[in-house]
């Protein structure tokens, strides 16, 4: 049994615990029947529900872009392919740079990869779980949640996170290379050359974004917001056209991928958008309760990590929450100390969703890549913390020290 299978077994263990809690909550709660252990698992049933309810949000984000992937590849290919080939990189890296793996990046990467499976997975699941989500999701969502006064800390954190994405990608690529990733029994050939050469365009984009966040942070952040709105519009067009094609047979946009199984598809080998979403939700039934219960059971060690980083308890809790979903973390930012705000935003760039949506997506689409993706995301997140600690404004150092002393 490999590490990817072990991770799946662990999540299913937590899924069963959460299912028991949901059942017992109908009859007075888990504590009533299971005593001390029951009390320790109470609330996991609610996370069980959250995991399944995520299906709707996932569908809105994924279905339209998944259907549009071959169309976008056809339109963008003549421009993207020559540029990336000139840099010595596979064109699929474009997809993971701008799109999250679960917002079309994985499927667009496949269309642009030209048959190079390793490059497709490197972009679609490793890069597409770090840089893409930051640009199309995390920054726009954060701006709608955080206080305006915290935007400077968001910019500093994202800057720290962006520059360490290549480190996370290389780490994930090396794990994939040495773990012997296979698809349908066939080995996927990750090489040093592929891992390093495909980082060239990513490094260029990372440096440009970092410079923009350093010198024109407000304009850069507003630019991300505009891009995200454009993307939502594009996804909506794709979703509407795909539904019309499925229900009425009208092909409003030629070349759309089916969103349900089509004639010729082999069950178990080909999964269309709607089935992928269902598979992800099944994984989230265990992933969300797992994060809740691990946070509860290991609260003291996690708080000690916060003390080690010299941040308050809210900031430490935010980092743990980020591993499942960064939205709660952004909601907690106003209660964090300055250092905690920058560190949390930096950590979230790569590490967000590592034990949530991205884990579910990898498990549903390519479970051989679960471990490489998680390792890459965590290494990217941890190294981002190191950079963020150097970027905390010096004029806030006294405030950080005072806030830390107030907790002790």
UniProtKB/Swiss-Prot annotation:
Biological pathway = Amine and polyamine degradation; ethanolamine degradation
Instruction: Tell what triggers its expression.
Output: Part of the 17-gene eut operon transcribed from a single promoter, induced by ethanolamine and adenosylcobalamin (AdoCbl, vitamin B12).
State the phenotype upon gene disruption.
Answer: Unable to grow with ethanolamine (EA) as sole carbon source. Slightly attenuated in a mouse model of infection. A double eutG-eutH deletion is not impaired for aerobic growth on EA supplemented with cobalamin (vitamin B12). Cells are unable to grow on EA at low pH. A non-polar deletion mutant does not grow on EA at pH 5.5 or pH 8.5, poorly at pH 6.0 but wild-type at pH 7.0 and pH 8.0, slight decrease in acetaldehyde release on EA plus vitamin B12. About 25% reduction in survival in mouse macrophage assays. Bacterial growth is not enhanced by exogenous EA in macrophage survival assays.
Q: Pfam families under this entry? A: EutH
Q: InterPro entries annotated for this entry? A: EutH
Q: Give the reaction(s) catalysed.
A: ethanolamine(in) = ethanolamine(out)
Example GO molecular function term?
Answer: ethanolamine transmembrane transporter activity
**What does UniProt give as GO cellular component?**
plasma membrane
Q: Which residue spans traverse the membrane?
A: 1-21, 61-81, 89-109, 126-146, 155-175, 192-212, 230-250, 274-294, 313-333, 342-362, 369-389
User: Which keywords does this Swiss-Prot/TrEMBL entry list?
Assistant: Cell inner membrane, Cell membrane, Membrane, Transmembrane, Transmembrane helix, Transport, Virulence
Q: Name one GO biological process term.
A: ethanolamine catabolic process
What is the annotated localization of this protein?
Cell inner membrane
Topology within the bilayer: Multi-pass membrane protein
Task: Report the protein's function.
Answer: Probably involved in the diffusion of protonated ethanolamine (EA) into the cell at low pH. At low pH most EA is protonated, and this permease becomes necessary. Contributes to bacterial survival and replication in acidified macrophage vacuoles, but not to bacterial uptake by macrophages.
Q: Which family does it belong to?
A: Belongs to the EutH family.
What NCBIfam families does its record include?
A: PRK15086.1-1 (NF011665)
Query: Under which name does UniProt file this protein?
Result: Probable ethanolamine permease EutH
Q: Which gene encodes it?
A: eutH
